[in-house]
Regions:
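Transmembrane-helix motifs of polytopic, lipid-linked glycan transferases
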Residues: 67, 168-191, 229, 436-442
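Start-transfer (signal-anchor) and selected internal transmembrane alpha helices
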Residues: 1-97, 287-299, 512-515
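Membrane-proximal stem/loop segments at transmembrane-domain junctions that anchor or position
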Residues: 123-128, 312-405
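Transmembrane-helix signature of polytopic, membrane-embedded enzymes
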Residues: 179, 184-206, 244, 449-458
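Multi-pass, polyprenyl lipid-linked donor-dependent membrane glycosyltransferases
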Residues: 169-176, 199-234, 263-270, 476-481
Length: 682
């Protein structure tokens, strides 16, 4: 029986690496075949030039970092007692400065969650808030909303200014992200080497996403603490001799897994990875020593789920099991295009009144799509989904952080017209990461020994397989970013060992990192030359592009104030033109200074207006003598027109998206702002 069980365990490992290695190889190829976010470079590089340039950049970056790390790591190891905390503190400081100096607004689902959590401070249930329909469809985000509500209630008790609440929750995000990071460091130090743990920290230090993603505040980033924490606590439990402490740690593991699952469903993959790993540690099928550990984990999970269930019952105001979309909806939606969100599928599922009808309809449509695709179509879909979820090095940061609560000079370099530098670096870095992860998997499969880090391999394998059947998005790899970085650190350590052996035979190789640094400078000089010849640069004075409407209609006369001391010559207004060229409305736009002087004037033609997009108006450059409050007036010049244009605004009545101005229609409407942007285009 023992021999049979050993054979089963070997088979599991064979299947694991037979899956994870080819999928990682394809993801690596995909990482070298995309320039998303680098608009100027996309216009210059085509076909095989893209992977050739990115492969070269990734190689140069890896060689340069290898040289730097070889010098730094021994010094940090000697002074690890204070150097490692100092390194972590440096990264945390950079994250905090990112939040405080680049004041972006939450957007999309993130904003809905935050706004609703703020509304719960005054309302009894989510059902009483503006976004109740959203949470009725997607109750999976209710835990995140209640989590945010807890922190906002604390902010209220501590008298933290309301205008700082978005930055406040992002600081909470930093805490949870760094808890996850610390757990990864401890696991690597324990099961690989302290050097590998320090490499992991240094690789995070030079990863811009580690700072950009603190602006996100969403389930993807917060779940890092729960998934990584569960792995670390599980490991500590297995190494503890005290039975009482051991079961307490397993109990805590269950709490972390259940709480993390409620925050982000992908934590279930971590739970599955730990379960499989625990099964692989059983010496024989008759060995029941692990039963107590399993029961402790289950007890912790049941307790956490029970507590959340009571909280949901208190604050939801509806039955999520009846109103929520069925699980099969996300599977069905993923079997089209590249597997991403599709508004038509959302509307299709929402058109049915009961959950049973929605489930039956989604299952039927899923069957139809699978039948139409056939084996070849499914293979293409799976390849595309892997690339969307794991090959993109930007994690869609450019769109996630577009709305600026305060204008920042770095905005154009982060996600504006000079964003090629950052996007190109991220793609090069991601190519390096994917290559080193593949190397680590190959080494483990053919030359490595079984160890606790196999949990990481199992987790990433589960992530790959999960997104073959689930809806995907560019940002959906974020819950696994620390696991990828752990494997990247292992891969970097393997490369360094090989480099040291080569250097013993060829001393001139020691100059390779310096040559790589020179090569990187040349590459980015080329990127700079291309970028400066690209699209015009926008210097924003105001950027508030989020919209959600209530019963207010902005179709005739209204105004919006804004404050700036920067020059501007363009205004973007987000509008909805439902009738296209048949829209016969005409509006006059005027921008008034504080003394009532007309600073700019333009015309808005309804027939030329887009639908749910920005209408751009240009005029002569306005140069303020000093910072002042301007008034943007919109007036319908032909009131007898048959069709009017809808001007969009953000108006839940809870959160003020633009604190330096107000909307008047004709009286001031509190906490409501036009969806608009004011900028100078150079």
């Amino acid at each position: 029986m023992a021999r049979f069980w050993d054979g089963c365990k070997k088979s599991i490992y064979v299947v694991l690496f037979a899956v994870v290695i080819p999928l990682s190889a394809y993801i690596f190829y995909g990482a070298l075949d995309t320039l998303d976010g680098a608009a100027a470079l996309q216009g210059l590089l085509h076909g095989k030039m893209v992977p050739a340039v990115l492969l070269g950049t990734s190689f140069l970056l890896g060689l340069f970092l290898l040289g730097v790390f070889r010098r730094l790591i021994p010094e940090i190891e000697k002074r690890a007692r204070w150097a490692v905390p100092a390194l972590i503190a440096l990264m945390a400081l950079l994250q905090i400065l990112t939040v405080l100096l680049i004041r972006t607004s939450l957007r999309y689902d993130h904003l809905k969650i935050f706004d609703t959590a703020a509304a719960l401070l005054e309302q009894d249930t989510v059902a009483d808030t503006h976004f109740r329909s959203y949470f009725m469809k997607y109750p999976n985000n209710l835990p995140m909303c209640l989590f945010t509500y807890f922190w906002l209630r604390l902010a209220q008790l501590l008298h933290i200014p309301r205008d700082f609440w978005m930055e406040y929750v992002k600081l909470i995000n930093i805490v949870f992200m760094n808890l996850g990071m610390w757990c990864g460091y401890r696991i690597l130090c324990r099961h690989r080497s302290r050097g590998a743990g320090i490499r992991y920290l240094l690789l995070l230090l030079v990863n811009p996403l580690w700072y950009l993603l603190v602006e996100m505040y969403y389930t993807s980033t917060l779940s890092l603490a729960f998934s990584m924490g569960a792995i670390w606590v599980f490991d500590c439990a297995g190494r503890t001799r005290s039975r009482r402490k051991k079961y307490l740690l397993y109990f805590l593991t269950g709490i972390l897994l259940a709480a993390g699952y409620e925050i982000r469903a992908t934590v279930i993959i971590t739970a599955a990875a730990l379960l499989v790993y625990a099964a692989l540690q059983v010496k024989s099928l008759g060995d029941l020593k692990k039963t107590g550990a399993v029961l402790a984990v289950l007890l912790g999970a049941v307790l956490a789920l029970g507590i959340y269930g009571k909280a949901e019952e208190r604050y939801a105001g509806f039955d999520p099991s009846e109103t929520g979309y069925p699980t099969v909806h996300w599977i069905m939606m993923s079997f089209q295009g590249d597997g991403q969100y599709n508004s038509a599928d959302d509307a299709y599922t929402g058109s049915f009144s009961t959950k049973e009808e929605r489930t039956e309809a989604d299952v039927q449509r899923l069957r139809e799509r699978i039948g139409q695709m056939g084996p070849g179509g499914l293979l293409t879909l799976f390849r595309n989904k892997l690339r969307v979820a794991f090959s993109d090095g930007t994690d869609d940061y450019a769109s996630l952080f577009l709305t600026m609560r305060e204008t920042s000079p770095v905005q154009k370099y982060m996600n504006g017209s000079r964003g090629d530098y950052l996007a190109f670096y991220l793609h090069g870095y991601h190519g390096l990461l994917c290559g080193l992860v593949l190397l680590a998997f190959l080494f483990r499969a053919f030359r490595g020994k079984r160890c606790f880090l196999d949990v990481v391999s199992l987790n990433l394998c589960g992530a790959y397989l999960f997104y073959l059947i689930w809806e995907v998005d560019d940002a959906y790899s974020i819950p696994f970013m620390l696991l990828f970085l752990m494997m990247e650190a292992v891969g970097m350590e393997l490369v360094e060992d090989g480099f040291a052996r080569i250097q013993e035979k060829a001393r001139t190789v020691r100059f390779a990192p310096a040559a790589a640094a020179a090569g990187l400078l040349a590459v980015f000089a080329g990127v700079a030359a291309v970028g400066r010849s690209g699209a015009p640069v926008r210097e924003y004075a105001v950027l508030q592009d989020q919209e959600t409407s209530r019963d207010l209609l902005l179709q005739t006369d209204f105004s919006q104030t804004f404050r700036t001391g920067k020059p501007f010559d363009h205004v973007d207004l987000w509008v909805a033109n439902w009738d296209g060229a048949a829209n016969d409305s005409v509006y006059e736009l005027r921008i008034l200074e504080e003394d009532g002087t007309v600073a700019a004037r333009a015309e808005i033609i309804g027939a030329q207006a887009p639908c749910i997009n920005a209408y751009t108006v240009s005029f002569a450059r306005v140069v303020p003598e000093a910072e002042q409050t301007y008034t943007l007036e919109i007036r319908l010049t032909n009131p007898d027109c048959a069709i009017k244009t809808d001007f969009l605004y953000y108006g839940t009545g809870v959160w003020d998206m633009y604190g330096d101005g107000a909307l008047y229609a004709p009286e001031e409407i509190p906490n409501v702002d036009l969806a608009f942007a004011v900028y100078e285009q150079k």
